[in-house]
């Protein structure tokens, strides 16, 4: 059984002016997704800026979201690390806190080999008893999980899914062919329909932070056989999706949410605020779609 089908939001983490986590706003964001069509909440994925958090804060954010959701939707905890023992530690803690699943980015910077990937994920698999989503995002990590490697990983009982953000649809199709028991989620908002067309069952989405219903609807339309409606909505959203990635994620999505009145603060350094030129491009994309700007 899949961890979820549909749209999983890669939830942002709101910060106060002095950069502490704004738990009051975080609670409102969680409630927003509970009230809308979001199918799962991914806390402390890349969009949630866990690389800027010490472990105690990272785990407190995970705990808070799990408690707030209270079992109403699956909560998947981002606990990836390029240090295997650290990844194991965070995984065990997230499981203890009640996470429904774990999202693990591949080791980054030190990168490793395909053999190292298998050994890394085997250690994590053996340490927990909840589902693991492998996250392949070579543009950030410098490391690509090959389909043959994913086939080996699929033999591990807790490796249940992959978030595929390589941008290579042929590779996604090869994973679907070689790994029939692995659920595939698009890791790119501009490729939801293409990934679904080769066997995907959903998306882990940045876009869903601001348009949760529309993101869910793309997947629902496609999986219900309304392929043309899914395609039309995917294309209609493309200008906003492009604007959300005009600078490094999550800079634009946080700016968009602030424009919409969510008051999520700015990203932590080394990420910064948007340039004025790009901010105007983002603002125009939101207005053109019909989103109410409250600034």
Curated annotation (Swiss-Prot):
EC numbers, comma separated: 4.3.3.7
Tell me where it resides: Cytoplasm
Q: Which CDD domains match?
A: DHDPS
Q: Main EC class of this protein? A: lyase
Q: Where does pyruvate bind?
A: 47, 204
For the site Part of a proton relay during catalysis, which positions are given? 46, 109
* Active site, renumbered: 135, 163
In terms of Pfam families, this protein maps to: DHDPS
Q: Name one GO biological process term.
A: lysine biosynthetic process via diaminopimelate
Q: In which pathway does it act?
A: Amino-acid biosynthesis; L-lysine biosynthesis via DAP pathway; (S)-tetrahydrodipicolinate from L-aspartate: step 3/4
- What SMART domains does the record point to? DHDPS (SM01130)
Which keywords belong to this entry?
Amino-acid biosynthesis, Cytoplasm, Diaminopimelate biosynthesis, Lyase, Lysine biosynthesis, Schiff base
One term under GO cellular component: cytosol
Q: Which Gene3D superfamilies match?
A: Aldolase class I (3.20.20.70)
Coiled-coil residue windows: none
- What GO annotations for molecular function exist for this entry? 4-hydroxy-tetrahydrodipicolinate synthase activity
Q: Which reaction does it catalyse?
A: L-aspartate 4-semialdehyde + pyruvate = (2S,4S)-4-hydroxy-2,3,4,5-tetrahydrodipicolinate + H2O + H(+)
Q: What is its main location?
A: cytoplasm
The entry describes its oligomerization and partners as: Homotetramer; dimer of dimers.
The family classification in the record reads:
Belongs to the DapA family.
Under HAMAP family, the record lists: DapA
Q: What is this protein called?
A: 4-hydroxy-tetrahydrodipicolinate synthase
Species source reads Caldicellulosiruptor saccharolyticus (strain ATCC 43494 / DSM 8903 / Tp8T 6331)
């Amino acid at each position: 059984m899949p961890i979820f089908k549909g749209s999983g939001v890669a939830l942002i983490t709101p910060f106060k002016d002095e950069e502490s986590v704004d738990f009051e706003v975080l609670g409102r964001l969680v409630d927003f997704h509970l009230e809308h069509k979001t199918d799962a909440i991914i806390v402390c994925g890349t969009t949630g800026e866990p690389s800027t958090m010490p472990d105690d804060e990272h785990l407190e954010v995970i705990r808070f979201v799990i408690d707030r959701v209270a079992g109403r939707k699956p909560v998947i905890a981002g606990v990836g690390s390029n240090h295997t023992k650290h990844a194991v530690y965070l995984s065990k803690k997230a499981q203890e806190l009640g996470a429904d699943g774990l999202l693990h980015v591949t080791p980054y910077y030190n990168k490793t080999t395909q053999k190292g990937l298998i050994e890394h994920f085997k250690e994590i698999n053996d340490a927990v008893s909840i589902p693991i989503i492998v996250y392949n995002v070579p543009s950030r990590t410098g490391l690509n999980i090959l389909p043959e490697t994913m086939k080996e990983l699929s033999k591990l009982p807790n490796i249940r899914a992959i978030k595929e953000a390589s941008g290579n649809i042929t590779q996604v199709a090869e994973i679907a062919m070689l790994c029939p028991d692995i659920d595939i989620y698009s890791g790119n908002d501009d490729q939801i329909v293409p990934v679904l067309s080769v066997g995907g069952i959903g998306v882990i989405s940045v876009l869903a932070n601001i348009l949760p219903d529309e993101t869910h609807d793309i997947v629902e339309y496609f999986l219900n056989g309304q392929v043309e409606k899914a395609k039309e909505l995917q294309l209609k959203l493309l200008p906003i999706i492009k604007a959300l990635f005009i600078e490094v994620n999550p800079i634009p999505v946080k700016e968009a949410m602030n424009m919409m009145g969510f008051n999520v603060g700015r990203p932590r350094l080394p990420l910064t605020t948007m340039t004025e030129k790009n901010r105007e491009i983002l603002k125009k994309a939101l207005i053109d779609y019909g989103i109410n700007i409250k600034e």
